[in-house]
Swiss-Prot record:
It comes from Schizosaccharomyces pombe (strain 972 / ATCC 24843) (Fission yeast). One of its GO terms (biological process) is mitotic cytokinesis, division site positioning. GO terms for cellular component: cell division site; medial cortical node; mitotic actomyosin contractile ring; mitotic actomyosin contractile ring, intermediate layer. Pfam families: Nod1. This is Uncharacterized protein C12B10.10.
């Protein structure tokens, strides 16, 4: 069953509203329909993969249906996660701007862009207060719409698989729909911060909180989380085959009405720009992954390079054996050195078992090595982060001491002049 929805506004209250307020109420109720539907989904895996034209039509049709009549008796419980998520993106990107403009308007995009979110990585409360001050200037209905939007994001975040690339692409996707097209890259960090701090900024009360997601995305594997190379390769392969890997050039025209066909290029552009800072017509994924290794958008401190590499281990290969090879030896009596077939088969079985055990030990060693390397990388990052924080605090203390010494000297000088 879907999460319970609030009762639709009664006709008497609708008559007291202005037409625009009634439109806002409908749009907010439509968002709450998505919120209720996502809350019962176990996961949203593969929703960021490419989708066919038929699936796109289904997404657009569903978003239009909800926008036109959000109070209809349409259950979203049975809608596949992929279609539901795509419909949600189209609803926010196309349906809401058609009726009420973008949720985050251009003037507020510029103000959100001016905040240095990396500077508040260790003290998000101060940043949250700045965001609250900006949102206090929103209209009541736009603020409610934004609150429900990030409430949905809070529900979706813990249901991602946890892969770094998937989180970046997810943040890029929602950045591409919540604001005008020309500000997709500019507000990426703002959207990421709001997605992680939404409960504090908008005073949301429902679980879960994705604070652990912040550490996974920003700082790398922790607490035994092990991102293995084969998992990355599988995701790279699926990403290379997706429609997001082909970017379409487009003009940033704020007056142009949104088009449902440009959702995928928007997501890809945001994903591409979020890592490199520039737009390109073709996305080279291998280059992207190299950039990810050297520059982490979410981490406040650059990743430290590891200073050691464990040597690779050989994996034994079991080859077939010629049972009759002893007869080829230049012996006067070959039968003196032959063993019975039963003994040979028993020894050969032991050999195969030993090879299998060695392969298992090698595999276990490989996994342990990856775990150690991940822990070493995490430890190095933590040390670098601590040293940076310590250096900043020491500089602040020195500046404060200089300021106090200066005040003391000025006070002494005034005393001497007065006497």
């Amino acid at each position: 069953m879907e999460k319970p929805l609030p009762n639709p506004p009664i006709q008497e209250s609708l008559r007291k509203q202005s037409p625009q307020d009634a439109v806002y109420d409908d749009l907010v109720f439509g968002l709450k329909r998505y919120e209720a539907a996502f809350s019962i989904k176990d996961s949203i895996e593969d929703v960021l993969a490419n989708f066919s034209k038929d699936e796109e039509k289904e997404m657009v049709c569903l978003s239009t249906s909800i926008a036109e009549n959000p109070y209809q008796s349409l259950s979203l419980e049975s809608v596949p996660s992929k279609i539901l998520f795509g419909s949600f993106l189209f609803y926010v990107k196309d349906r809401i701007p058609e009726k009420a403009g973008y949720i985050i308007e251009e003037q507020f995009c510029k103000r959100l862009q001016q905040i240095d979110y990396d500077a508040y990585s260790f003290s998000p409360k101060e940043c949250n207060e700045k965001l609250k001050n900006i949102f206090s200037e929103f209209s009541q209905m736009k603020l409610k719409m934004l609150s429900v939007f990030f409430s949905i994001v809070q529900i979706l975040l813990p249901k991602l698989s946890g892969d770094y690339q998937e989180h970046v692409q997810f943040f890029a996707s929602i950045s591409a729909v919540v604001a005008p097209r020309g500000y997709v890259f500019e507000i990426y960090h703002a959207v990421e911060h709001l997605s992680l701090e939404a409960r504090e900024v908008f005073q949301l009360h429902h679980p879960p909180s994705p604070k652990q997601t912040r550490r996974v995305v920003s700082e790398g594997p922790l607490n035994g989380v092990n991102y293995k190379q084969n998992t990355t390769n599988n995701r790279v392969s699926s990403f290379q085959n997706s429609q997001y890997s082909t970017l379409n050039n487009f003009q940033n025209n704020s007056n142009q009405s949104p088009n449902s066909n440009d959702l995928q290029p928007l997501q890809a552009e945001a994903f591409h720009s979020a890592h490199n800072g520039y737009s390109s017509s073709t996305l080279n994924l291998n280059s992207e992954l190299n950039v990810m290794k050297d520059h982490d958008l979410q981490a406040p401190i650059p990743r430290a390079l590891k200073q050691h590499k464990l040597p690779p281990i050989p994996v034994p290969e079991v080859q077939t054996t010629n049972i009759g090879y002893q007869t080829d030896l230049p012996l006067q009596n070959p039968n003196d050195n032959l063993v019975s077939l039963a003994i040979y088969e028993a020894l050969y079985e032991k050999f195969l078992k030993a090879c299998k055990d060695l392969e298992e030990v090698s595999k276990s060693y490989e996994e342990s090595r990856e775990e150690i390397e991940a822990l070493h990388e995490t430890f190095t990052e933590e040390v670098t982060s601590f040293q940076s924080t310590k250096r900043l605090k020491e500089e602040k203390i020195i500046q404060e001491k200089s300021r106090v010494d200066k005040m003391i000297d000025e006070y002494r000088q005034k005393l001497s002049e007065s006497t």
